[in-house]
Amino acid sequence: INWKKIASIGKEVLKAL
């Protein structure tokens, strides 16, 4: 599992909310 990629995607999701 690529945690850095998950973290970056998570940040983008939070921005989109």
Curated annotation (Swiss-Prot):
UniProt key word Secreted: yes
Cellular component annotations (GO), alphabetically ordered: extracellular region; membrane; other organism cell membrane
Modified residues (Leucine amide): L17
Membrane as UniProt keyword: yes
Tissues in which the UniProt entry reports expression: Expressed by the venom gland.
Subcellular location as annotated: Secreted; Target cell membrane
Keywords: Amidation, Antibiotic, Antimicrobial, G-protein coupled receptor impairing toxin, Immunity, Innate immunity, Mast cell degranulation, Membrane, Secreted, Target cell membrane, Target membrane, Toxin
Molecular functions (GO terms): toxin activity
GO annotation terms (biological process): defense response to bacterium; innate immune response
Note: Most of synthetic analogs show a decreased antimicrobial and hemolytic activity.
Function text: Antimicrobial and mast cell degranulat peptide. Has activity against both Gram-positive and -negative bacteria (B.subtilis (MIC=25.8 uM), E.coli (MIC=7.3 uM)). Shows mast cell degranulation activity (EC(50)=15-26 uM). Has low hemolytic activity (IC(50)=80 uM). Its mast cell degranulation activity may be related to the activation of G-protein coupled receptors in mast cells as well as interaction with other proteins located in cell endosomal membranes in the mast cells.
Stated family: Belongs to the MCD family. Mastoparan subfamily.
Name used for this protein in its record: Mastoparan-like PMM
Species this protein is from: Polistes major
Source lineage: Eukaryota, Metazoa, Ecdysozoa, Arthropoda, Hexapoda
